């Protein structure tokens, strides 16, 4: 089983591909539709997966994936576990501005706060950004889609040379606060 690598295929002209990975598919379809419907200056392919690794079938026909988004529902432990297990199927080059975590239900109770801390630690250990999204309203889904499109544009190399994926990574990385660092080091 090969690792998913961001540079194994040649990019298509004026086209970017985002892979949305969500175990429960609660937000995945809404977000995919919002991304496709947003007005943009480039073509966007949206691919959906429940988990990684991707199936070997149609590997040659699959486009280059410019951004991988792990959608984690904080109400579900299984959602977090699926994202954690999927990370092992990514090549290390993916973690330079090509992966992010999108979390939902961050305001729902104490269990979600514990899982949010776990996601933030996971993201910080891989130098990936964490985006919180409201998936219960159309405006929340639209705002999340717009943020992902901005990140996708940079990760696909469709912005001026001064803004690279590495630069984006330094701007959006999940930094640990001092109390999280203490927990992380223990």
From Swiss-Prot:
| One Pfam family here | CENP-M
Answer yes or no on keyword ATP-binding. no
Which UniProt keywords are given for this protein, alphabetically ordered?
Answer: Centromere, Chromosome, Nucleus
- Keyword Transport attached: no
Q: Which cysteines are disulphide-bonded? A: none
Q: Which GO terms describe its cellular component?
A: chromosome, centromeric region; nucleus
Which Gene3D superfamilies does the entry link to?
P-loop containing nucleotide triphosphate hydrolases (3.40.50.300)
Compartments in which it is found: Nucleus; Chromosome, Centromere
Chain's role? Probable component of a centromeric complex involved in assembly of kinetochore proteins, mitotic progression and chromosome segregation.
Q: What is the official name of this protein in its record?
A: Centromere protein M
Protein species of origin: Danio rerio
Gene behind this protein:
cenpm
């Amino acid at each position: 089983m090969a690792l998913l690598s961001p540079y194994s295929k040649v990019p298509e002209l004026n086209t970017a591909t985002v892979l949305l990975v969500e175990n429960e598919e609660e937000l995945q379809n809404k977000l995919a539709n919002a991304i496709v419907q947003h007005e943009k200056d480039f073509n966007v392919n949206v691919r959906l997966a429940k988990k990684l690794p991707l199936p070997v079938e149609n590997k040659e026909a699959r486009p280059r994936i410019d951004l991988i988004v792990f959608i984690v529902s904080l109400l579900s432990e299984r959602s977090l576990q699926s994202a954690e297990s999927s990370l092992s199927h990514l090549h290390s080059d993916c973690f330079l501005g090509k992966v992010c975590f999108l979390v939902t239900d961050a305001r729902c109770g104490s269990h979600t706060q514990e899982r949010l801390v776990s996601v933030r630690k996971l993201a910080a250990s891989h130098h990936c950004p964490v985006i919180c999204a409201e998936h219960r309203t159309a405006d929340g889904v639209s705002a999340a889609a717009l943020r992902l499109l901005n990140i996708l544009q940079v990760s696909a190399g469709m912005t001026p040379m001064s803004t690279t994926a590495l630069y984006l990574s330094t701007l959006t990385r999940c930094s640990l606060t001092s109390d999280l660092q203490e927990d992380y080091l223990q």
